[in-house]
Amino acid sequence: MLYSSLPVCFLVLGAALCAPERMQNEAEPHDLQPHEAEPHSDHVAPLAKRSPHYDFGLGKRAYSYVSEYKRLPVYNFGLGKRSRPYSFGLGKRSVDEDQSNDEQQLTTSDLDQAALAELFDQYDDAEKRARPYSFGLGKRFADDETSEEKRARAYDFGLGKRLPMYNFGLGKRARSYNFGLGKRYSKFNFGLGKRERDMHRFSFGLGKRSGDDVSADDSDNYFDV
């Protein structure tokens, strides 16, 4: 009987030792007012929220967004969305350096269509696309205004379009290379049946003499009697 009561005594002693200690001036929980029931509630509530430094994860960003479907300007790029230094491609060209900042672009966008029309009227059709990257199929950089050299630009060459120094090919030669079959300079224009007019020293052969040479030979062969 004595041995069976020993475990019960140990349990009672352990419960007494493990009971929370209370100060004498501390009130009982059931005696507290409703507003004093949880004095540490203000300190426990922030534990459920993360710091903005660690407020990221699946569907959570390190920055605060107005909406979860809106990106910051730093990440505002993708299909059809490019930042201004990279806003070029098919049909999109980079702007000049003087118009790269946002203030100048806002000023340009505020101009009405009438002012833009007056600005473009000052230039001809060839100069409307006079930009460093404004060239392509049928679009080239423009310098002069003459009709013949309207497309004779630094990049204005291709199929049937050449600069004057490269404007040669089948049936097209520059003046320095404009010779070939049936095409010679005057100093090289000699051959079978072709002699230079002023080079009479080579204009002889079977039945071919100049009139001056024939008269001189006749005078030498015949003497007056």
UniProtKB/Swiss-Prot annotation:
Q: Does the keyword Signal apply?
A: yes
Where found, per UniProt? Secreted
The Acidic residues compositionally biased stretches are 214-225
Where does it sit, as one GO cellular component term?
A: extracellular region
Report any Pfam family annotated for this entry.
Allatostatin
Task: Could you list this entry's UniProt keywords, alphabetically sorted.
Answer: Amidation, Cleavage on pair of basic residues, Neuropeptide, Secreted, Signal
Among the GO biological process terms of this entry, one is: neuropeptide signaling pathway
Instruction: Tell me which domain of life the UniProt entry assigns to the organism this sequence originates from.
Output: Eukaryota
Kindly indicate where the leader peptide sits in this chain.
Answer: 1-18
Which residue ranges make up the pro-region? 19-48, 94-127, 141-149, 210-225
Start and end residues of each stretch annotated as Disordered:
205-225
User: Which family does the UniProt entry place this protein in?
Assistant: Belongs to the allatostatin family.
Q: What does this protein do?
A: May act as a neurotransmitter or neuromodulator.
* UniProt-recorded name of the protein: Helicostatins
